Structures are given as C-alpha cells and as structure tokens.
Design a protein with these regions (language model features):
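Conserved, structured core segments of small domains
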Residues: 2-113
Length: 113
C-alpha cells in the first residue's frame, strides 16, 4: 500500500507508553535512578537496532512515549522485558497501541526553531 506516493512499511508501528513502577524512586531525577547507565545503554541499543524510532518523557515525566517498529505487540513486550529497569520493576508498560503512521516530516529535514 502507498500513501502520497510513499510505500508504507510492512512492519507495523506501535505507540508505547511506559510508566513508573513501584521500584521507581520519586525523590530522584531520572538520570539519578538506580541502574540509569544500564537502562540508557539498553534503550540506545534499541534505537541502534531500529526498534525505537522516537521516544522520551511526556507531561510531568511520570510516563514516556515511544514510537516503535516491531513485528507485533508480543515482540514489543518481549524486548522491553529485557530492560534493566523492567526487571527492577522501575518501569512498566502502561499501554501499547498499533499505529498507522501516515505522516512523517522527519525525512524532509524540517527543523523547528
């Protein structure tokens, strides 16, 4: 299928909300949390693999929103389960939604001031 002359990818996209779990220390900033370096390295690896397309904290920072490209929801869950923060119950999957990404200005090099 194509939209606007662009061919859509066969692999689906997912909007994934991650939320703080009971292991999260609310008195500490994100980069001061236990195992920050291990978590950051893990997430950087997912970016390098092309699994995480975009991501970061939203609103007050109690949740993060990620755009992920995966074969299905099971793959999203399985890969995120390997995050050191998941095993420490610091970060949990709040919601996973399939996302039909039709608009994408990133490839046009449109930078905002």
């Amino acid at each position: 299928m194509s939209v606007g002359g662009r061919k859509l990818r066969a692999m689906p996209y997912f909007a994934v909300r991650l939320v703080h779990g009971p292991g999260w220390d609310a008195s500490r900033q994100i980069r001061e949390q236990d195992a920050w370096d291990a978590h950051a390295a893990f997430m950087d690896g997912l970016v390098d693999d092309g699994f995480v397309i975009l991501g970061g904290p939203v609103d007050d920072g109690h949740e993060t929103l990620h755009l992920m490209e995966a074969g299905g929801e099971d793959e999203v869950r399985a890969r995120l389960a390997r995050d050191p923060w998941a095993s420490a119950d610091m970060l949990r999957i709040g919601r996973i939604e399939a996302w039909a990404l039709w608009l994408d200005g990133r490839s046009r090099g449109l930078a905002r001031p």
